[in-house]
């Protein structure tokens, strides 16, 4: 019979059990909901890959990740389970437990009867934790299994004579395996020691542990295995010296080769000796021999592996570094130039004289007429004000490109630099934020703008394509599909930006005016995922936490859901093994709007190559990482209407091999399309990427020096020029100085960003589209800011990817030109006046323009009202670059007048303000030359008139006629080109 006290405990026990079951139920519910979310995300991700025709790539990647996880987990589980089984097998059959062994007694009472279950659970849990890190190695695993060999004369590293592919494809995964194996053995050894203690094989009766003989055998074998794994690690560490950053340059330098390499070899043999000692100790009593072996190992690791190399570096290398490091500097130079794609840069000299003649100025009117009057970074508000048409439209990015304008009467026309932007919907500015508005009605942007960067009408841009519905001027390309479902910089981003197309709710195309009803449309493409059954709808409703998808009668089985609509996010999701540029840009091709995104293959394992300087890159650039190898071998092209994505292998354009891309093409056959299959209308708009040239220019400034001693002394080393800035004149970037680790003063000036320009490259006969950046000599604190050279990257199909450096005499560089502009009284007075009269001044980016054998700089001067802030182009600044204070500044209300201010030549337009002409500008010319100049002036004047009027067909014809006259003028005057070295 129960006592009253026992009866009183029953309700309390029942209540506690009830609360426990409630907690368990809540936990199970939370896990279930989380699992549903995970499963829904997993399933809908697969549907997304299927929608862009990459389902096979998704499956392959999933199988690899799952295989790595379960493979490493199974391996760890088996080894640990066997070891714990051995522990149970070696447990003493009889054990006298003292008072201090209470923990062991309880363990044996409660756990020993369930030893197999406990062993299995522990092995499973620890194995799953240990294997989780293997999932992230999928990239290295795929490169390991499918990596191809490098070919060519520099295919082997100079130290170990192994193919470079070994370092890029094999070494990273092998290093992971060795590291994982060693850490796993350490974890297993700890678990085994604990298990032996709980089983009584290890006793600590009075503070001095005792180990049973059979336990010593077990632990000795485990420790020997750890020593063997460490030995393999030392072998791999030898190869990793090729990536060392301990010397003057990256790679195995003198101390690495003559001190660290022998030390690693010695440590390899000592680790093998330690393994043998541990196995020999199985038949000996005590641990004296293993302790001696491990102690010797630690002593050698410290003395030979750390202290000895430090002594060699300090005593032998540092006093004679310029002599001892020369062979290794030579290796670093060759590897870096090859790995970063700057080993085939063409070098030319550019005289940069101030001797332009009148015929030369006129002969270069195609270049002067193509300077960018409209800087997309500063004038974006102007384009938005004039062309957004509705508050909910925005131009999230403006890009610089070039387009061919057709001429009349069969004339070939001409190429014009264009500012290009796509009109996208900004969700945050919609008239209403309801679910229907956000996801069903305002689903897409509409149309694009194409505006000549070299033309202005009433201080505002001219437009080749504008308005809604889209209008194309004569001679300009036509848009047949203006709807934009996929774009850049989606304001919401992620899953929140999904839209539904082809629903019962008409989608808004555009509203021509506030008094008119919106024009609507229905989607007829195959973009996104079709909601064709109950399970697909349910999965997306769970993923987004939005059950309107499930219950709305506006959504049908034909509706298509688009939920990854940012171009960069799409590419990152589809090809996570590539790195991506910071600046996708739109292209109009065949009446369709496409987005082009540059993609890179990168590595930080190229032997002897220096890590790239990426400090000047935008924060969202995929090249913002540790890398010492890069290739722009892929162009991603996305249709703005359908979202269909193509990855084009463009390595054939630059005629450079890319073994990393070749490897990914083996891994994912059919994913990459040869550039030969890219439509010609798209190929015509490929650009050399800014991010890549930013990295290459930063490195080439030093690595154009190929003599090791000159490289060591930094003789003739260059930096990318300090930026001249842009925007408000009073926001000039401040110059600050810091001291580096060698005690030298370094400047923290921002560097000049590359600029796309359409101009006649010295030595060429016609303008081409190029990416340009400038060099200045390396100096303490950037105190020397004269130009040292100009790097030009070709973007036209005929010279795509060709890098040319024009070395110049010490003429004023961009920062000095900026100072000259600020010191010009006409400019500074105008800025002061405008900034105090209800307006403000914005300066565009400074452009470097080679003209003949001279160098010009151009900068647009915008004025915006404080009450209606969108910039208008009011003034033009042109600088004729000289040296030591001889640069001349032209400033006027038209480009023609500013040029006349410099050259005192007869140009179409206004009369100049009359400054003293530069040397040679008044040379007498023959009557024939004068007639050609007059004809060129007439043709140029007519071309500008047609351009401002938006008659692009006539403009193309005018430009073609002008080119013919200019060719005659060049022949008549013998205009010189640059000399080559």
Predicted feature descriptions by range:
Residues 3-13, 19, 25-50, 54-949, ...:
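Soluble extracytoplasmic regions of secretory-pathway and membrane proteins
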